[in-house]
Design a protein with these regions (language model features):
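Short, structured beta-strand/loop micro-motifs enriched in basic residues and often containing a Trp
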Residues: 4-15
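Right-handed beta-helix
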Residues: 14-193
Length: 193
């Protein structure tokens, strides 16, 4: 029998859009024929069998749906807990969970960003770098706390620190205010001890 081109049915197909899932070589497929004519076959779907088993085991709840590629990239839907999970073979993961009321992004290097009711948390075993070609603005209706177990450095063309009520600069060991030009200390009353 001569080779025949076979069309593939998809669950959605339209101009330059739709689903794109082709069976692998050697997969078991279900074939139909347009107008019952064997010259015009169409693949209707794929089947699991003893050689190609399902990546999941069915249960009575039937709450898990998934798309798993041959390289084990996975998109999983959990209808019971309302969770969507996207994961790569290297364990880069996105979890969107109504059950935990959170969104979490984790990579294979243990960097993570978590959005939940208590706020947003970023974690990294190494550095976190934030860059912008424009401005970076941070605003909080409460406090902003910046702390480091080692040095804390602020560098800019000009550095301005303004307090609406009080301003304290303190060094437990030493403190220095210096300039290569003029240095001015002003106040209604200046006390130097």
């Amino acid at each position: 029998m001569a080779d025949t081109w076979v069309r593939m049915a998809g669950f959605y197909a339209t101009g330059n859009a739709g689903s794109f899932f082709l069976p692998e070589i050697g997969d078991e497929v279900v074939v139909g024929f347009f107008d019952n004519d064997p010259r015009f076959p169409v693949i209707l779907g794929s089947l699991y069998n003893g050689k190609n088993a399902s990546p999941y085991t069915a249960d009575a709840k039937n709450s898990i749906k998934a798309i798993v590629t041959k390289s084990l990239m996975k998109l999983e839907f959990n209808d019971e807990k309302k969770i969507i999970t996207l994961v790569t073979p290297g364990n880069n993961t996105i979890i969107i969970s109504d059950d935990a009321k959170s969104i979490e992004i984790t990579d294979q290097n243990n960097n993570s960003i978590k959005l939940e009711s208590g706020g947003i948390t970023m974690n990294s075993p190494k550095d976190i770098n934030i860059k912008a070609t424009g401005n970076i603005n941070m605003n909080a209706t409460g406090k902003i706390n910046v702390s480091a177990t080692q040095d804390l450095a602020l560098t800019g063309l000009n550095v301005a620190a303004t307090a609406q009520v009080g301003f304290t600069g303190k060094g437990n060991a030493t403190a220095e205010v210096s300039a290569s030009g003029q240095t001015a200390i002003k106040g209604a009353m200046v006390m130097i001890n």
